[in-house]
Amino acid sequence: MNREKRCDPRRCIEYEIPGGWRVLAGKTDADNDFVSLKVAKPRDWWFHVRGIPGSHVLLLAEHDQEPDREALKRAAAIAAYHSKARTGGLVPVSCTRAQYVTKARGTKAGSVQIRKEIVLKVHPPAPEQMMEMRVAANQQFDESP
């Protein structure tokens, strides 16, 4: 199944960042599980704000490309924006390869365990910047985290 069809716009928001990288953000707890556990491939990068509710975010690694630090920071900033830390200044965001994201049996939707975490500190983008990165198929802008 190709990723174009696996990312239902009702379940995730899609962005494109410089370098042609695609970034997906889950909309609800159940959508976060879908993005993190069904859409994600092992080499993708996974992001979530540390200790604060928010979206699970994926930086899609197409054709085994390696994102540079700037791409990782931009995806982390998208995770910061889609969290309750949106207005919190400098935000710590956990980042790891999707292969290190697992779900324990019986845990609630949106709850995952991660290994091999890297923490990036980023400022959430302004809403105008988020609109510029938004992919056309998902143009209906939603202000909720």
Model-derived features with residue positions:
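Duplex nucleic acid-engaging cores and interfaces of nucleic-acid transaction enzymes
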Residues: 1-145
